[in-house]
Structures are given as C-alpha cells and as structure tokens.
Amino acid sequence: MDFNLSREHQLIRKMMAEFTENEVKPIAAETDEKTLYPRENIEKLFDLGVMGMCVPKEYGGAGADPLASAICIEELSKACASTGDIVATHNGLCCDPILTHGTEEQKAKYLPMLTTGHKVGAFCLTEPNAGSDASKGQTEAKLEGDHYVMNGSKIFITNGYVADVFVVFAMTDKSKGTKGISAFIVESSFPGFSVGKHEVKMGLHGSPTAEIVFTDMIVPKENMLGKEGKGFNIAMQTLDGGRIGIAAQALGIAEGALEEAKNYTKGRVQFGKPISKFQNPQFTFADMELGCEAGRLLTYQAAVLKGQGVRYTKEAAMAKLWCSEHAMKTTTKALQMFGGYGYTKDYPMERMMRDAKITEIYEGTSEVQRIVISANMGL
C-alpha cells in the first residue's frame, strides 16, 4: 500500500496551491463581504482545465481521476470555501452524472460545454418539502409528444443563478414513488426556466445559491438522463461522488484554519512568550493535525475507490462525515486562539467557521451520513 501521491498528483497540488495563494486568497475576504461570485477565477480554472477535469479528453476534459479533483477542491478551500464549492458542484454533481449516465449524443453535446465551453453546471434535487427525504419531491415532468413539460421548483441550488446546464430530478410517474423519479439535462435557456430567490446565507457568500423555478418548461425527450424511473438511483449514486467533493472542501477549510492559527499563535506574545509555546494550544494543535490527517486518508481512499470503479458509498459517507465535523471543530477552536481578534473580520477565522457549518448539512446531513454508514455495515 503506497501512501505517496503520484508525480502527477503532486504537480496538480503544487499548481493549485500556487493558484490559491496568488489568485484566490487575495480576494477571499472581499468575495465573502460583498457576496461576489468569483467569476474571473472560475474562468481561469476553466482555462487551467480544473472545471470538468475528470471528463475524458475526447469531450474536452483533462481525463483526470477523482483524486485529482479532490486535491484541487481541497487546495482551493484552504483559502476560499466558496470557490471550492463551485468547483465541487460543477465536477461532481453535473459533469459526473452526464458522463456516467448520458447517451453518446448527450455526452458529445454537453460535456464540451462544461469543459472548453466554459459553461457552469448545477444539480437540482432539493425542494421545500424534500430535503433529506429526497423521495418526496413534487416537481413533475409530463410527456407530451416529443418533449416533457416540467413544473415545480428546486431550492438551495449551488451555482443556481450562474449555471447554464442543470441535472434536474422530477416525477414522471407519481404512483411509483422513488421509481417514478427521472433525471433530465436542462439548459437555462429552455422556455419556462427561471431563477427565483437568491439565498442569503450564513456562509459561502461567494457560492451562488438560488431557487430554480420551472413553469411549463419544455424539455426535449432526448434530454432524459438515463432511463425513465431511474432518477432516484442516479441521484443517490451522484451524491456518493459529491460527498467526496464536500469532504475535500471541509478538509481544506480545516487545514486552512489550522495554518492560520499556527501562524498567529507563533507571533502573538502573552505572558512573555508566544502562545504557541503553551501546552494547551499545543494539545489543541495536535488534535487538529490528527483530525486533518485522518480526514485526508478517508477522503483520498474514497476518491481512489471511485476511480477504481468499485463501490465506495460507505467510504464517501465516512469521509464527508469526519471532515465536515472536524472542520467545524477546528475552525471553532482556531477562532478561540485568536481571542477577540478572531471575532472580527480583520482575520479570516469567523468566515472559515461560517463556511464550515454548511458542510455538516448539504450533500446529506451528518445524521444522514451515519444512516448511510450503518446501512452498509451488514447490521
């Protein structure tokens, strides 16, 4: 068992660390404070081949593996979790299901748009009355001739008001429960598509989150993703992969907070010496480091398993659960080390703590992750 990254993965980490330091970190505070979508940096990430990087080269992607994508999200999130979130959603929740379940015609049309075409992707599953219980969605798609007519709405959609391509889940047969859910590829230009409420959130201010509304929206029949009635399975499989992205995001937040706290405590002198020299902060740092290392191993393991094409549902849930809860603990403890300064916007700690919280909620709450893990333990 080799725990060393390949040369390719090392180069990807180096590239993303440099990009994050030079392009992402300098605008992270302003992105949060002014609720700005980091458009220029996302365009640069398209140019670097990070957006849609796991898409095969014949469709415009880099042909990278899931571990490479996780490393990119991790590095970006050390400075700006919003940027990491945008990439994670695009790569894991839009490109991936189209690549995995799309027809050759769908892949040939949409994957180049999501790579070299600089079109942003999104994933529409959650509804006002269907959060953790995704089977209770009310959005409907009725077949009329050569197209479907879709009505309903989705909420909390990451990339919502900037995305061009959406993977949407709707009921095609309400009498069949989860077996009546189908998946569709939807474009923001389709008649009847509109963006509703822009969410005002506690954190991730640079990640555009919105309600998406479908009013008699026309969806061509050929835009059904996978077979009719298989949408729920597609959603669950996609979320497995998406959880690796959120684990990487949360890991990056924790690592970034740890580094900020280390640097601050080395320079902050109290009672005649840097506070990093006191035993209590050192014990806290040890716990932070331990948690980050464990989270990294869990996340990379899940990513490698996905790349090998074997089942990784439990491993993805474990990585997401551990990293998200560790990010919340680490940012809270790191902020405490800054004292009163940590509570101000002069330092990034309060932003990191606000950003960390959502990782315990979206892509399946911590409670849902525990359900998934226990369900895959043969109990």
Feature-to-residue mapping (PLM):
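A short, Trp-centered hydrophobic/proline-enriched beta-strand micro-motif
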Residues: 117-125
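Conserved hydrophobic/aromatic beta-strand scaffold that supports enzyme active sites
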Residues: 122, 138-140, 165-169, 183-185, ...
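Flexible, small-/acidic-enriched active-site or ligand-binding loops
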Residues: 136, 189-220
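Short Ser/Thr-interspersed hydrophobic loop/turn segments at strand-loop and sheet-helix junctions
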Residues: 49, 73-77, 170, 186-191, ...
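Flexible, glycine-rich active-site loops centered on histidine and acidic residues
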Residues: 95-101, 123, 135
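Short Gly/Pro-enriched turn/cap motifs at secondary-structure boundaries
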Residues: 114, 129-132, 156-159, 173-175, ...
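A short core secondary-structure module
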Residues: 146-147, 151-195
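Alpha-helical interface subdomain recognition
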Residues: 1-89, 101-106, 113-118, 131-134, ...
